[in-house]
Amino acid sequence: MKTLPKERRYETLSYLPPLSDQQIARQIEYMVREGYIPAVEFNEDSDATTCYWTMWKLPLFHATSTQEVLGEVRECRTEYPNCYIRVVGFDNIKQCQSVSFIVHKPNRY
Protein backbone atom coordinates (compact mmCIF):
# COMPACT_ATOMS: atom_id res chain seq x y z
CA MET A 1 0.00 0.00 0.00
CA LYS A 2 1.34 3.41 -0.92
CA THR A 3 1.13 6.12 1.71
CA LEU A 4 1.57 9.84 1.40
CA PRO A 5 4.85 11.32 2.61
CA LYS A 6 4.78 12.80 6.07
CA GLU A 7 4.84 16.56 5.91
CA ARG A 8 4.73 18.98 8.78
CA ARG A 9 1.52 20.94 8.84
CA TYR A 10 1.15 24.20 10.65
CA GLU A 11 -1.64 26.69 11.12
CA THR A 12 -4.05 28.37 8.76
CA LEU A 13 -3.28 27.86 5.07
CA SER A 14 -0.69 25.14 5.82
CA TYR A 15 -2.07 22.73 3.24
CA LEU A 16 -1.44 25.23 0.46
CA PRO A 17 1.92 25.95 -1.17
CA PRO A 18 3.98 28.61 0.65
CA LEU A 19 2.47 32.07 0.33
CA SER A 20 4.16 34.57 -1.96
CA ASP A 21 4.86 38.09 -0.69
CA GLN A 22 1.87 39.32 -2.68
CA GLN A 23 -0.43 36.75 -1.06
CA ILE A 24 0.94 37.61 2.39
CA ALA A 25 0.24 41.27 1.65
CA ARG A 26 -3.37 40.45 0.75
CA GLN A 27 -3.87 38.54 4.01
CA ILE A 28 -2.39 41.42 6.00
CA GLU A 29 -4.54 43.90 4.06
CA TYR A 30 -7.61 41.93 5.16
CA MET A 31 -6.46 42.02 8.80
CA VAL A 32 -5.90 45.78 8.74
CA ARG A 33 -9.20 46.39 6.93
CA GLU A 34 -11.11 44.34 9.53
CA GLY A 35 -9.52 46.31 12.36
CA TYR A 36 -7.41 43.48 13.78
CA ILE A 37 -4.18 44.43 15.51
CA PRO A 38 -1.30 42.72 13.67
CA ALA A 39 1.76 41.31 15.40
CA VAL A 40 4.76 39.33 14.21
CA GLU A 41 5.97 36.31 16.21
CA PHE A 42 8.82 33.86 15.76
CA ASN A 43 9.91 30.53 17.22
CA GLU A 44 12.60 27.94 16.53
CA ASP A 45 10.14 25.06 16.83
CA SER A 46 6.72 24.68 15.26
CA ASP A 47 5.46 21.83 17.41
CA ALA A 48 1.70 21.95 17.85
CA THR A 49 2.09 21.82 21.62
CA THR A 50 4.13 25.04 21.60
CA CYS A 51 1.61 27.63 22.73
CA TYR A 52 3.95 30.56 23.32
CA TRP A 53 5.95 32.20 20.54
CA THR A 54 8.32 35.13 21.00
CA MET A 55 6.83 38.41 19.87
CA TRP A 56 8.87 40.51 17.45
CA LYS A 57 8.73 43.99 18.99
CA LEU A 58 5.29 45.16 20.14
CA PRO A 59 1.99 44.59 18.33
CA LEU A 60 1.42 47.16 15.60
CA PHE A 61 -1.47 48.92 17.35
CA HIS A 62 -1.62 51.85 14.94
CA ALA A 63 -0.79 50.05 11.69
CA THR A 64 -2.78 51.58 8.87
CA SER A 65 -1.02 50.05 5.88
CA THR A 66 0.12 46.66 4.73
CA GLN A 67 3.63 47.98 4.12
CA GLU A 68 4.18 48.74 7.81
CA VAL A 69 3.49 45.13 8.75
CA LEU A 70 5.44 43.69 5.80
CA GLY A 71 8.42 45.83 6.82
CA GLU A 72 8.40 44.21 10.26
CA VAL A 73 8.09 40.74 8.68
CA ARG A 74 11.13 41.46 6.49
CA GLU A 75 13.16 42.68 9.47
CA CYS A 76 12.24 39.58 11.45
CA ARG A 77 13.17 37.31 8.51
CA THR A 78 16.57 39.02 8.30
CA GLU A 79 17.22 38.76 12.03
CA TYR A 80 15.92 35.18 12.49
CA PRO A 81 16.30 33.26 9.20
CA ASN A 82 16.32 29.87 11.00
CA CYS A 83 13.02 30.41 12.81
CA TYR A 84 9.38 30.03 11.91
CA ILE A 85 7.72 33.42 11.58
CA ARG A 86 4.00 34.04 11.74
CA VAL A 87 1.67 37.00 11.59
CA VAL A 88 -1.21 37.08 14.04
CA GLY A 89 -4.22 39.37 14.20
CA PHE A 90 -5.81 40.25 17.53
CA ASP A 91 -9.44 41.32 17.79
CA ASN A 92 -9.62 43.96 20.51
CA ILE A 93 -13.42 43.67 20.76
CA LYS A 94 -13.54 39.91 21.36
CA GLN A 95 -10.13 40.08 23.09
CA CYS A 96 -8.71 37.09 21.30
CA GLN A 97 -6.43 36.09 18.47
CA SER A 98 -8.55 35.86 15.32
CA VAL A 99 -6.04 35.27 12.52
CA SER A 100 -2.71 33.46 12.46
CA PHE A 101 -0.61 32.20 9.58
CA ILE A 102 3.02 31.31 8.94
CA VAL A 103 4.91 33.62 6.60
CA HIS A 104 8.38 32.04 6.81
CA LYS A 105 9.67 28.51 7.34
CA PRO A 106 13.37 27.73 7.81
CA ASN A 107 15.16 26.05 4.91
CA ARG A 108 15.52 22.83 6.88
CA TYR A 109 11.84 21.95 6.18
Swiss-Prot record:
GO molecular function: ribulose-bisphosphate carboxylase activity
Function summary: RuBisCO catalyzes two reactions: the carboxylation of D-ribulose 1,5-bisphosphate, the primary event in carbon dioxide fixation, as well as the oxidative fragmentation of the pentose substrate in the photorespiration process. Both reactions occur simultaneously and in competition at the same active site. Although the small subunit is not catalytic it is essential for maximal activity.
InterPro entries: RuBisCO_ssu, RuBisCO_ssu_dom, RuBisCO_ssu_sf
GO BP, one annotated term: reductive pentose-phosphate cycle
Subunit structure and binding partners: Heterohexadecamer of 8 large and 8 small subunits.
Location(s) in or outside the cell: Carboxysome
Primary gene name: cbbS
Taxonomic classification: Bacteria, Bacillati, Cyanobacteriota, Cyanophyceae, Prochlorotrichales
Pfam families documented for this protein: RuBisCO_small (PF00101)
Species this protein is from: Prochlorothrix hollandica
The protein's name in its UniProt record: Ribulose bisphosphate carboxylase small subunit
Family: Belongs to the RuBisCO small chain family.
Keywords: Bacterial microcompartment, Calvin cycle, Carbon dioxide fixation, Carboxysome, Photorespiration, Photosynthesis
GO terms under cellular component: carboxysome
Main subcellular location: other
Miscellaneous comment in the UniProt entry for this protein: The basic functional RuBisCO is composed of a large chain homodimer in a 'head-to-tail' conformation. In form I RuBisCO this homodimer is arranged in a barrel-like tetramer with the small subunits forming a tetrameric 'cap' on each end of the 'barrel'.
Coiled coil stretches, renumbered: none
